[in-house]
Amino acid sequence: MVIADLRLEYSSNVGFASDQGGRGFQHPSHMAMRSDKRIFVASRGVGPTVGIQMVSRDFEFFGKIGSQGTSVGQMMEPSAIAFDSDENMYVADEKLDRVTRFDYEGQVIDAWGVSGKGLGELRRPTGLLIIDDVVYVSDALNHRIQRYYTDGRFIDQFNSTKTIESQLRYPWGITSGLDRDLYVADWGNDRIVRFDLNGNLMSVLSKGLGAELPLNRPADVAVDPDGNIYVADWGNQVLQIFDQNDKFLYMSRGEADLNQWALEYFEAQQDEKQARSSYVPVYETDTEDVREVSARIEPYFWDPCSVMVDADSRVYVLETCRHRFQIFERI
């Protein structure tokens, strides 16, 4: 569905359900791209699959940072990734209520965070953003955004103390645009909220496709250089794009095919390859549950949880339940 001049063309997808670790992801939750275009994916399955997987859009696999556990440098449920001006990596963990800092080589520097409801304390941190070496954290169960210095010293917070319109409910992904404003995926309120860097409300964007398909539990948000807003619309199982005036531009359900990693797997598993090649899928549409439809149709997004736009205007959408991200070119 296209309005105006913005359209996306499917390019490829990267990912593989990795149950035993190694190349691939397991229930990924977030992704971020470093300046060298290496892509970091938070994988949060069990055992050897937990950590930050490093890949490229060309199917290179560079290894993993972190392991499952509670010690400094380990993770349980990594939920968000961000980089500071020195390209240190920060990883939020919503199980441990902390943020861990790693250097460029992936060596742990420190970790900070205390569970609780007080100022500076965290309950399910789900989003990270770093601007001018100030760390913004979506503190989901406390329904607020908190700000810290990069060493974890608390600065301040903003949430529902100003106006009803600016109240957050389970904020999730957070990003910024060229305007240096903050864009928050306000998951529980089905909208995107825009603040300035000090937490002053600028605008509320919530219509999506309007009455036909309003936003439903948005998980993440990205902004391109033109100011267009990309939403991983988790509840509707789609990517929605609209402009800063809340005008709908484009929607995609996903178009994935078998990627290089999957094809290599089937080459090594000839029985599965033969069975798949002779199988003609019949998609039953006897349900209106969009998540169930996504589960049945392999090209579709299944729980889109993270979205980003790179410097070349490529759009990346990460899916939790299909353990992959789809890549689109803007045309």
Residue ranges of predicted features:
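Eukaryotic scaffold repeat domains enriched in small/polar residues
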Residues: 1-331
